[in-house]
Amino acid sequence: LIMAYAHIAHDCIIGDNSIIVNNVALGGHVEIGEYAIVGGLSAIHQFVKIGRHTMISGGSLVRKDVPPFVKAGREPLSFVGINSIGLRRRSFTDEEIGEIQDIYRVLYQRNFNNTQAINKIEIDFKVSKNRDEIIDFVKNSGRGIMRGYNQK
């Protein structure tokens, strides 16, 4: 669903069942995964990738890649939590949601750099499609992923 006055530049890829709310501006070559929601008045920098099942708050400036299954907000854009309500609506099990939550705790809340976090996730979590999707997204991020929330 693409709402009123949204601007979608050249060569963008928007996944199925995604929602682009009013007055969103997408730069060129932006990729948005399935079931993503981009809040109104948000601006997405060129070449940014937004993962599946994400929710980006309105008025956000998205300069970095946003991994799958998360909620993102604040300025600068940062991790707010996982999109648990959206995942439940799409029939993710409690076990899958718990696994995703635990993976993002390692990635964003344990003071590891991305390489250290990915190594720990690969060791500590059994292979699953959601784990592998998160790992692949972070490893293949061209612009780097958004940061974790810092209260400072």
Predicted feature residues:
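Structural signal for interior beta-strand "rungs" in well-ordered beta-sheet cores
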Residues: L1-R74, S78
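Terminal amphipathic alpha-helical/low-complexity segments used for targeting or macromolecular assembly
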Residues: F69, E75-K152
